[in-house]
Amino acid sequence: MPLENEYLDLWAISILANPLTKAPCSIDNFKIENGIIDARVYLKNTYGYSDWKVGQDAFEVMAVSGAGYKNGVQAYKKEIAYDQPIYDHFDITGDILDVGGLTGTLREFLNKDSRYISIDPFIEAIFKTPLEKIEAYKCLKEKFNFVGAVAEFIPFKSESFDWVHMRSMLDHVQVPDLALKEAYRVLKNDGALLVGMYVEGGKSGKKPLVRLAKDITKEVLSLVGLKKYKDFHTWHPTYHNLLKLITDNGFKASESFWQPHWKNQVVYVLAHKA
């Protein structure tokens, strides 16, 4: 389907909703930033906002600098290879919402017939993607649906999506429960939720001594002013905590897939409406 404007096609426009009232609305009801809908709603007076904002600002700097990808194109290609088993295992098709999807790298693994939207609070990421990342990910050379929004207030109509995808983002949101309630709302009744993230203690629930020592060292270094060692995540759930979060918000977890590269430390949980 051709894009109606640079960042939204007719399908995406047809399912827009006010992120607060959830009432259907049009592009004209939103503020536009650099051609992109800005539907971001922040809980500035709610506990945790200041910590979230500090972490979000740090993440945005890292995202555009390519931090953690010293080998450039090859590092991004390795990332693709590490993620491939996930999407070989889960058949993500249909109408897809990628929450915290940034520049839409999930598209690298999707069927071309699927309809896709990414939402993310970092609107500027669209214009500041590292060139090495664009070279590695074929999908980044193609246009896609993008809206500036946060996970806690999704600007789409209820029951609009077959899949809601949440990869490496639930430990970055201010209110995880609200993010999952919104995922529940926008999913079709037979839709699926996929949550992927590092869990504290991994599959066994016990943090290895080496990891524990590293975490303590990083905490000490951040306390003495070395900001590059500061942990900017908003929380660190165990596998049990993550399952509880999912089920407490109306879902039934049906399958857990442990990403091979991360050796039982990163899990992808498939869930459906209970």
Please place each PLM-identified region on the residue numbering:
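N-terminal, positively charged/glycine-rich alpha-helical extensions of SAM-dependent methyltransferases
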Residues: P2-A67
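Conserved alpha-helix/loop element of class I SAM-dependent methyltransferases that forms part
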Residues: G72-G94
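Class I SAM-dependent methyltransferase SAM/SAH-binding core
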Residues: L97-F153
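A conserved beta-strand element that flanks and buttresses the S-adenosyl-L-methionine
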Residues: H165
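A short glycine-rich, Lys/Arg-flanked "PGG" loop and its adjoining helix->strand segment in the class I
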Residues: D177-A192
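Conserved class I S-adenosyl-L-methionine
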Residues: L193-L221
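Short alpha-helix
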Residues: K230-N249
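Core SAM-dependent methyltransferase catalytic element
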Residues: K244-A274
